[in-house]
Amino acid sequence: MHCTGCWAAEYGHQLNLSLDDIDSIIRQGKELGTYMYIYTGGEPLTRKKDVIKICEMHPDCAFLSFTNGTLIDEEFCQDMLRVKNFVPAISLEGFETANDSRRGDGCYNSVKRAMELLKKHKLPFGISTCYTSVNYKDIASDEFFDLMIDAGALFCWFFHYMPVGNGAVKELLPTPEQRAYVYHQIRKFRSEKPIFTMDFQNDAQYVGGCIAGGRRYLHINAKGDVEPCVFIHYSNCNIHNTTLLDALRSPLFQAYHDNQPFNENMLRPCPMLENAGRIQELVKQSKAVNTDYESPEDVDHLLEKTVPYAKNWKPMADKLWDEQKK
């Protein structure tokens, strides 16, 4: 699957962490008090047997996987019922036309089949949706929320489109008015709809700003590079030759630690998207290197895409934040 504007597209698709690598990361994480682990792709369920094996090896942990849903079948549902510590979050970009225009023809119907199977077995699952300038009204509509609820979804992660990588499509970035629309709709439906929603970009107030850089979360890519965030493709270290604890002590992670929160306005939490120049400072200060192996992106090039967005979003963010504080 080749999704338009995918943030993971330029890592390359031939890299994988081994089962032993993943087991080691989890064992180290548990020593630090971490008992929840999230898989992202590519498509994590191409390794269904390993996913279930890890669940068996670590029954004291909870696991979630972002997935396109195409590989969820009867056998996998039975495995989920047996291990009881795995939950899928199925990617859905709106209704059929919007979804398949970004994720490929037929993907919407595959998602529907997966949700029907999960609901039949009374298995918990959620939805993951990326909102853009194209689909923002669809994913923030009564109809879309009701579709998720009727399908049996218990939660939905909402992700703002991120212009990461040389193949990013800047035109997919929502305008300030479009982002504000999503912001208001999600909050409105929280008091009206029986589904738990998390807006990764607009809910920073509940977690004190950016959670990346090991403050509450980090990302390890398929080659083992330890990154501050799934959207920040820069690193000083690799899990194959360092410990998780030492990765947290690496220059880039320490730069995050010393600078969070990146803004007192919790609607401007990200050092890349909403705070022009901050990610550039962090990367250059720490001498971190880009981890997009197929098409490396210089941090100055990344900055060129986000400076206009940050400038345009600031007045709207300040207005919304002031309204919240009243």
Regions found by a protein language model. Name each.
Residues 3-6, 210, 224, 229, ...:
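Short cysteine clusters
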Residues 1-19:
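Canonical Radical SAM [4Fe-4S] cluster-binding loop centered on the CxxxCxxC motif
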Residues 1-4, 35-39, 220, 224:
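N-terminal pre-triad scaffold of radical SAM enzymes
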Residues 22-39, 47-159:
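Radical SAM/AdoMet-radical enzyme domain recognition
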Residues 61, 100-213, 222-223, 227, ...:
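Radical SAM enzyme [4Fe-4S]-AdoMet core and its adjacent flexible, acidic
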